[in-house]
Regions:
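Generic detection of intrinsically disordered/low-complexity segments and helix-coil linkers/edges
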Residues: 23, 35-37, 53, 74, ...
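Short, well-ordered helical secondary-structure segments
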Residues: 6-8, 19, 59-60, 64, ...
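Conserved SGNH/GDSL esterase-like catalytic core that processes O-acyl groups on lipids
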Residues: 39-152
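Alpha-helical cap/lid subdomain in secreted, periplasmic
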Residues: 5-6, 11, 84, 106-258
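N-terminal secretory targeting modules
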Residues: 1-70, 252-254, 258
Length: 258
């Protein structure tokens, strides 16, 4: 009599179970490798290790009587279309997707100072903060501190050039997508709020202008308006329209004071 354990159906079942276990193990191993690579990638970018880009914008002299404004930052600036419509004001978009504040330093001369702007509007820092919340980063505070130091650098450098600076509050984040839940800790919102407080202090102590955009993204003091977002980090046309309104009120007053 043959044991049922060795029956064709049983052997097929055992093979199927072993194959699925092997597949599960392989998927787990690949996930850990991907997680490790992603962690290294985010850490190195936060430190500015790797390649850097520039916008390759051609220099154009401002017509007499016109104010030149450079929008400087990451994808949140790159997606900032259209810019505010202000009489006698031209805007140059110097935003590059994914950049940290350290990476932005490499192109600061080429993409900002070279244009000899009257005003610079900065929206930056979120990519440093998402690097800091990446699972596996050993010292998240190190990356946050570097970002704060970089923001002080921009404030000081533009002040030395007698260029007016408007630092906008770092836009908040919306709900994490499923992939981001796998790779990011949940402290991003708090880190953005804390960093905004610190950057606001830098701006006020150095004579720069800080534009708090909380009212664009919050229905009241705490309820985030998710209708202003297209994904976890990026905002939609309605949000940009509200930001443009705020800048349209602020920038002319800065132009008149020059």
């Amino acid at each position: 009599m043959k044991l049922s354990f060795f029956s064709p159906k049983t052997r097929l079942l055992v093979i199927s179970v072993l194959a699925n276990l092997a597949l599960l193990f392989a998927c787990g191993w690949l996930f850990l490798q991907a997680k490790s690579s992603y962690t290294d990638y985010r850490y190195f970018r936060a430190l500015g290790i790797g390649t850097s880009e520039s916008t390759n914008l051609k220099y154009e002299a401002s017509p007499a009587g016109e104010t030149k404004v450079v929008l400087f930052g990451d994808s949140r600036v790159q997606n900032w279309i259209p810019a505010p419509e202000i009489d006698n004001t031209i805007f140059i978009n110097a935003g590059i997707n994914g950049e940290t504040t350290t990476e932005m330093q490499r192109r600061f001369q080429h993409d900002v100072l070279r244009h000899q702007p009257d005003i610079v509007v900065m929206q930056a820092g979120v990519n440093d903060l998402t690097a800091a919340v990446t699972r596996g980063i050993e010292d998240p505070q190190e990356l946050i501190d570097i970002m704060h130091s970089n923001m002080q650098y921009y404030i000081d450098a533009l002040k030395d050039q007698n260029i007016q600076l408007v630092i906008t509050s770092i836009f908040p984040n919306s709900t994490y997508s499923i992939p981001k839940r796998l790779f990011w800790h949940g402290s991003l919102s708090a880190d953005i709020i804390n960093s905004n407080r610190i950057i606001e202090g830098f701006a006020h102590s150095s004579g720069a202008n800080y534009l708090d955009l909380s009212s664009v993204f919050y229905r009241d003091s705490s309820a985030l308006n998710r209708d202003m977002f297209i994904d976890t980090l990026h905002i939609n046309a309605s949000a940009y329209s509200e930001i443009n309104k705020a800048l349209s009120e602020l920038l002319p007053t800065l132009s008149q004071s020059q």
